[in-house]
Amino acid sequence: MSDFFLYRDNDIDMGYRRDETPVPEHFKAHTHETYELYCFLGGKGIYRVEGTPYPLKAGDILIMRPAESHYIDISPDRPYTRFSINFKAELLKGIDPKGHLLSPFINRKLGTFNLYRAENFKTDAYKLFIDNMTENSPDRRVQIITNLLPLLNEISAAFETMSEIQIDQTLDSRIINYINRHISDNLSLDVICERYYISKSHLCHIFKKATAMTVCEYITAKRLVAAKQLILSGISPT
């Protein structure tokens, strides 16, 4: 396998990449309008989803839904290898009209239950599906779809065994959840600081550490994705 390849069409955006000396500054916090399945294949780092830190081990899988902010805090000391696939919900509509395969992405709070490890799966079949998607094929789209669907089914089965545990949320997590619940409201630093009894400097510090974005950048990114989703669904965002 080469150190880099991409496949893109109307429904799928898939890539494999290896950086011998990763540059942490190149990996910025971002969101997507699509669903993402990310596989960490090698390196050293922490993946952060909506402020939740996930220390990584080779073979870890993470899932993110549209507008779920994420980035990797990568160490430059080791080569960084990863595989990711982004896909639209339309890809699954005719196959899975009840949304079973998207349940792990949707039926949870932001920044929770993003990480899947070997112990979460009943068998090692999921590894085969990942390997197959990264192999050369005369019809890459067919190869991707015929392996993505059973992989999503394995993740869905693993998700059903997970139990919701009440966790005392950190301040940054509470603020992130508050912003997402009120993303259409008149949000400002003053409003957030008044609600959580903190100074603007403290808010900006903990928020940037958790998300790699400023509060304003985060709100803008979320609103842009929400507006695009409304437009795609035929609804005016105003």
Regions found by a protein language model. Name each.
Residues 1-21, 66-135, 152-157:
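A hydrophobic/aromatic-rich effector-binding and dimerization subdomain
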Residues 30-47:
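Short, conserved beta-strand element in jelly-roll/cupin
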Residues 51-65:
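Short acidic-glycine-tyrosine-enriched beta hairpin
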Residues 59, 202-203, 207:
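Short hydrophobic/aromatic patch on the recognition helix
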Residues 133-150, 169:
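All-alpha amphipathic helical-bundle segments outside canonical DNA-binding/catalytic cores
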Residues 177, 181, 186, 190, ...:
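Terminal helix-turn-helix DNA-binding modules in bacterial transcription factors
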Residues 193:
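The alpha-helix within a helix-turn-helix
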